[in-house]
Amino acid sequence: MEQRRKRSREALYLTNTPTTIAELAFADRMQIAFFDKATQNRLSFSGHESFQCRSLWLKKGYDFVNTGHSFTDEDAVVELGVGKNMVNAIRFWMKAFGLTYENDKPTPLANKLLNDIDGWDPYLEDEGTSWLLHYQLITASRASTYGLIFNGLRRDKIEFTKAHFLNYARRQAEIRGESVNDNTVKSDFDVFVRMYYRADTQTKERDEGLTGLLTDLNLMRPLRRKKEKEDDLHFVIENTEKSSLPDAILLYGILANRQFDLSVNFNTLLTEPDQAGIRELSFKSIPDSMTVLAKYYAR
């Protein structure tokens, strides 16, 4: 296992040239544009059947569609070995992470990441892959809660609760001329929490691969207060430096952003709104990041 982990880490973060990363990043730009057109950038808080994405689902989903199957096939339940609701959930998360198109065909990123023959990290063993998926989840805009929280809510409130998010989602929907179902939004927030926060009671679930896919990033934690009910629990998103973020993932996040051209001000990455896909990677200190840019662009 350790040898395989080392191989995937080298393949993903050491041997990829800037050209390879750039090609994939610009393909991702077009992919996000396609998703925006397909969804008309509408808010979405459902589709996951109340299941957070589990550790093996993306690989399972990729292997399924990469052999020509579709999640709408009659035998999808049998082939995937899960119930109908979980089939729907796997399909949702594949799209939410930007790994499949509307027709269930794999995207370029999915092929680069999950292919058994030459995929960078087919079994999602490296923490750097989790950072990449975190970026994808926010920027693919298929699961609105993640962008709303990382791009907006945490700017309004350092600490936030489910009720805070519900009110924020209502305001954002009103701005867009849309409406939201309160129960759906609250359920989606619960899934968001399980995606990023692993409670002590979930130790057994972790051993069985049932915890949220991004809990190891330790991006979010609860603030415990006496006599606080579960729905009133306050959360905070950490703003600490993350040494586990590989240089290549930072570069990918910058190049894949459609708002950037041939150059970008570094302060923009840190302070401008709507840069959550990059800024919320919580990347390393400024000197390290500048070194990264010089390393890749000076060639």
Question: Residue ranges of each PLM-predicted region?
Answer:
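Cationic, low-complexity basic patches in intrinsically disordered or flexible, solvent-exposed regions
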Residues: 3-7
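Polybasic, low-complexity terminal segments and linkers that are predominantly intrinsically disordered
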Residues: 11-20
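Donor-sugar nucleotide-binding helix/loop cap in glycosyltransferases
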Residues: 26-299
